[in-house]
């Protein structure tokens, strides 16, 4: 099923380039540069901004300001009217101005189609202050806007509410439009609240206009005074006041956020584009917390594990035999190892005491094994002359799975094969 996009660029099917070819091509229509915010395509945010401004102007000067007493109505007309007129002028000016770079406005023909950017020939659209699409030299802070299809001098951002880029030529008109909108909304909210409260507290204060002398009853109100008085009910007046208050509060929050942000940018001497680039390049503190710490060296690991890991004792299942291992890896020792040690020690009629010789391997594990042998009565005088030496530097057997647990049977085999001059046994047959 084919997905249709009404807002995308439509492709037209043309004849093959070669007369002999049978396959047609999909060719996109040429792309032209936009002059200002009134150039097509228009954005939906433009109409939303126009509708909100028109609604607030109508309810302010058609409903609420005429209901004020004579001294206050003149002040409201002057203050709110000045803010609304200033906003309208600056808004329209920011939309109408062409913010393109001076060389673009001098040399570029907006009616000619834009060339296609080839990233195999040029790494960036603007290379060495030369725009490959506009085909002109631009200023250092100029950026090529993909929506307007041209280079903008002192580029700040592309505003959807203006449908135009905000650059060096129209930035202060944009800033004035935002500031005047904030001032106008701040003046409008107290006016709406005053009318809403006085409607219940003292309606006579709002009915001082001469046209109210012909109206009977407090349930009927007049709007669009004094030019075209229209009667309406109290419910309609209150509903419009409630909608106006909510819309004004929402607009005030958004506009104040935008105004404070641009005041901060002006204090830092940067543009919106530069602020976004810095944010992208700065490291994220959350990512720093997720990075695991670097592992210490092997020696430090062995020492820390000696202090932190308690020794595992296999003495519980073996009443007269004990073995102690200090392991590098964490976790309990499996029971088959203790059983294997029991079989190996029982085969040679040996028993371990609490005295042990320690064998250390750099970067690996630390193992404690006893070296005092318990022999029969006839062999004890010979064994008393035996001198037991530590096995410093002897190779040991390591588990092929990467664990630091040592096979006890193989250790006994090394003791039997490598030190026959020290230890001598007679294996008794049953």
Swiss-Prot record:
<comment type="similarity">
    <text>Belongs to the DHHC palmitoyltransferase family.</text>
</comment>
<feature type="active site" description="S-palmitoyl cysteine intermediate">
    <location>
        <position position="159"/>
    </location>
</feature>
<dbReference type="InterPro" id="IPR001594">
    <property type="entry name" value="Palmitoyltrfase_DHHC"/>
</dbReference>
<feature type="topological domain" description="Lumenal">
    <location>
        <begin position="198"/>
        <end position="234"/>
    </location>
</feature>
<feature type="topological domain" description="Cytoplasmic">
    <location>
        <begin position="256"/>
        <end position="430"/>
    </location>
</feature>
<protein>
    <recommendedName>
        <fullName>Palmitoyltransferase ZDHHC11</fullName>
        <ecNumber>2.3.1.225</ecNumber>
    </recommendedName>
</protein>
<dbReference type="GO" id="GO:0005789">
    <property type="term" value="C:endoplasmic reticulum membrane"/>
</dbReference>
<dbReference type="GO" id="GO:0019706">
    <property type="term" value="F:protein-cysteine S-palmitoyltransferase activity"/>
</dbReference>
<keyword id="KW-0808">Transferase</keyword>
<feature type="topological domain" description="Cytoplasmic">
    <location>
        <begin position="98"/>
        <end position="176"/>
    </location>
</feature>
<keyword id="KW-0812">Transmembrane</keyword>
<feature type="transmembrane region" description="Helical">
    <location>
        <begin position="235"/>
        <end position="255"/>
    </location>
</feature>
<keyword id="KW-0564">Palmitate</keyword>
<feature type="topological domain" description="Cytoplasmic">
    <location>
        <begin position="1"/>
        <end position="46"/>
    </location>
</feature>
<dbReference type="GO" id="GO:0010008">
    <property type="term" value="C:endosome membrane"/>
</dbReference>
<feature type="transmembrane region" description="Helical">
    <location>
        <begin position="177"/>
        <end position="197"/>
    </location>
</feature>
<feature type="transmembrane region" description="Helical">
    <location>
        <begin position="47"/>
        <end position="67"/>
    </location>
</feature>
<keyword id="KW-1133">Transmembrane helix</keyword>
<feature type="topological domain" description="Lumenal">
    <location>
        <begin position="68"/>
        <end position="76"/>
    </location>
</feature>
<keyword id="KW-0472">Membrane</keyword>
<feature type="transmembrane region" description="Helical">
    <location>
        <begin position="77"/>
        <end position="97"/>
    </location>
</feature>
<dbReference type="InterPro" id="IPR039859">
    <property type="entry name" value="PFA4/ZDH16/20/ERF2-like"/>
</dbReference>
<keyword id="KW-0256">Endoplasmic reticulum</keyword>
<keyword id="KW-0012">Acyltransferase</keyword>
<keyword id="KW-0449">Lipoprotein</keyword>
<dbReference type="Pfam" id="PF01529">
    <property type="entry name" value="DHHC"/>
</dbReference>
<comment type="function">
    <text>Endoplasmic reticulum-localized palmitoyltransferase that could catalyze the addition of palmitate onto protein substrates.</text>
</comment>
<dbReference type="GO" id="GO:0018230">
    <property type="term" value="P:peptidyl-L-cysteine S-palmitoylation"/>
</dbReference>
<feature type="domain" description="DHHC">
    <location>
        <begin position="129"/>
        <end position="179"/>
    </location>
</feature>
